């Protein structure tokens, strides 16, 4: 395998924080400036949907002074009810985050709206979106299969809610919080298993951590939200791919600068360090309420097999599972995952997608309803292998790293889908290759 070395300052801005900064800016009173906003397709879909719903948004590209081009987004809004009835369906493209969180906002607006997406998003489950919003008084209709289009007849008279999350989901938590901001009174979200907490941090919501590990999130409705600036750090989920590249490369060392180190986002780093990965964290500081720092990754030849089953750990690494599975398979020949049925409802059925493609590379795999196991590798693919991306950016990027590890020629069914979250993915790999 090649050697990869260098300092990376061009990781994509964090996808989750970019979504939320734009949505909160649309709910705030005044001018919200967001620096280092993501240029990924999903985040651009959020801006497009907000514009179609009547929010004034300006986006410009600026030189960051270190060779990077940084996007700055400026949002003008008059507060919670600044939205206008859309004249067209709100097109979320491939972004489940846009569709789900925007539903919470549209449920509080006194008009009809419709959220739609691309073919992949239109297959994803939306009942978990509709249930709490119906309890709050919004009229929501879905397809017979419980999927989009999400048709919303909103109301200014949303009721408060005490909602216990049935599964760990930062998107559902956020949509309930956004809806509750419009309700007359205090609402509470009960979170048995922690998920990423950017929404709570960025809105400054009160939280209570109970002795039993359950978190309560308190939302006081109908209070004005003051506009404030946001600075978006580098995306730790994108960093995971470069970490895998560095660990699998020969005599490699990569430094990833200014990465978000929110504990709810970097559980995969703990998993890798416990398995013996050569990872270090440096220059940790706080920016905008989020811990940020640099990640140093070095080649590692003794990585132990990854076995992940704890519900809390699974929730913390759910987006990184594709890369962790490929990394563990190539580094140790083994990988095991349980309690991750949520992966079957992502951009693709990621359990099936991983098993299908790992088998094409010669790995012996077995899948279950909630996970799968990689038992070893029987053959090494020497000819060109066709990798089916299933229109899923994380599958495409994970198996690009697999191609580097295998030294094989892989043909991706949809290379461009990486641009959903990581527009410069392929260029960055080439820039690090020695």
UniProtKB/Swiss-Prot annotation:
GO terms for cellular component: cytoplasm
InterPro entries assigned: Enolpyruvate_Tfrase_dom, Enolpyruvate_Tfrase_sf, EPSP_synthase, EPSP_synthase_CS, RNA3'P_cycl/enolpyr_Trfase_a/b
Catalysed reactions, semicolon-separated: 3-phosphoshikimate + phosphoenolpyruvate = 5-O-(1-carboxyvinyl)-3-phosphoshikimate + phosphate
Pathway listed: Metabolic intermediate biosynthesis; chorismate biosynthesis; chorismate from D-erythrose 4-phosphate and phosphoenolpyruvate: step 6/7
Enzyme class of the recorded protein, top EC level: transferase
A Pfam family matched in the record: EPSP_synthase
Active site positions, chain numbering: 319 (proton acceptor)
Organism superkingdom: Bacteria
Key words of the record: Amino-acid biosynthesis, Aromatic amino acid biosynthesis, Cytoplasm, Transferase
GO MF entries: 3-phosphoshikimate 1-carboxyvinyltransferase activity
Positions annotated to bind phosphoenolpyruvate: 15, 96, 124, 171, 350, 394
Binding site for 3-phosphoshikimate: 15-16, 20, 169, 171, 195, 319, 346
Broad class of the protein's primary localization: cytoplasm
Keyword Cytoplasm annotated: yes
Cellular compartments annotated: Cytoplasm
Any Gene Ontology biological process: amino acid biosynthetic process
The keyword Transferase is annotated on this UniProt entry: yes
EC number: 2.5.1.19
Family: Belongs to the EPSP synthase family.
NCBIfam families: aroA
Task of the protein: Catalyzes the transfer of the enolpyruvyl moiety of phosphoenolpyruvate (PEP) to the 5-hydroxyl of shikimate-3-phosphate (S3P) to produce enolpyruvyl shikimate-3-phosphate and inorganic phosphate.
Subunit structure: Monomer.
Name of the protein this chain belongs to: 3-phosphoshikimate 1-carboxyvinyltransferase
Gene: aroA
């Amino acid at each position: 395998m090649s050697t990869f070395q260098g300092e990376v300052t061009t990781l994509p801005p964090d996808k989750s924080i970019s979504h939320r900064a734009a949505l909160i800016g649309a709910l705030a009173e005044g001018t919200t400036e967001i620096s280092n906003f993501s240029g990924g397709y999903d985040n651009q879909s959020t801006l497009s949907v907000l514009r179609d719903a009547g929010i004034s948004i300006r986006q410009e590209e600026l030189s960051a002074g270190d060779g990077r081009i940084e996007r700055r987004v400026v949002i003008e809004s008059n507060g919670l009810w600044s939205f206008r009835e859309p004249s067209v369906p709100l097109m979320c493209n491939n972004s489940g985050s846009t569709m789900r969180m925007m539903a919470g906002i549209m449920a509080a607006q006194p008009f009809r709206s419709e959220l739609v997406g691309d073919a992949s998003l239109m297959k994803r489950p939306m009942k978990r979106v509709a249930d709490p919003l119906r309890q709050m008084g919004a009229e929501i209709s879905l397809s017979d299969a419980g999927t989009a289009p999400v048709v919303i007849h909103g109301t200014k008279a949303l009721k408060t809610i005490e909602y216990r999350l049935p599964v760990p989901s930062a998107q559902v938590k956020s949509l309930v919080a956004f809806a509750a901001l419009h309700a007359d009174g205090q609402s509470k979200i009960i979170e048995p298993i922690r998920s990423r907490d950017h929404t709570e941090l960025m809105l400054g919501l009160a939280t209570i951590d109970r002795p039993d590990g359950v978190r309560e999130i308190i939302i006081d409705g109908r209070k004005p939200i003051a506009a404030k600036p946001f600075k978006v750090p580098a995306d730790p989920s994108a960093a995971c791919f470069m970490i895998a590249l560095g660990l699998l490369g020969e005599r490699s060392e990569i430094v990833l600068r200014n990465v978000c180190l929110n504990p709810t986002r970097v559980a995969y780093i703990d998993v890798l360090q416990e398995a013996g990965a050569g990872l270090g964290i440096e220059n940790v500081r706080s920016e905008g309420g989020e811990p940020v720092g640099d990640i140093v990754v070095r080649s590692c030849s003794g990585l132990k097999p990854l076995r992940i089953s704890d519900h809390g750990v699974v929730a913390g690494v759910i987006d990184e599972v594709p890369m962790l599975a490929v990394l563990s398979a190539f580094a140790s020949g083994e990988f095991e995952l349980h309690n991750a049925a949520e992966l079957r409802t992502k951009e693709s059925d990621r359990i099936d997608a991983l098993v299908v493609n790992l088998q094409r590379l010669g790995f012996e795999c077995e899948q279950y309803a909630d996970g799968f196991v990689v038992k070893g590798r029987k053959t090494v693919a020497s000819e060109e292998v066709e990798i089916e991306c299933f229109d899923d950016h994380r599958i495409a990027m994970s198996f690009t790293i697999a191609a580097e590890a295998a030294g094989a020629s892989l043909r991706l069914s949809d290379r461009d889908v990486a641009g959903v979250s990581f527009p410069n993915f392929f260029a960055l790999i080439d820039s690090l290759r020695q």
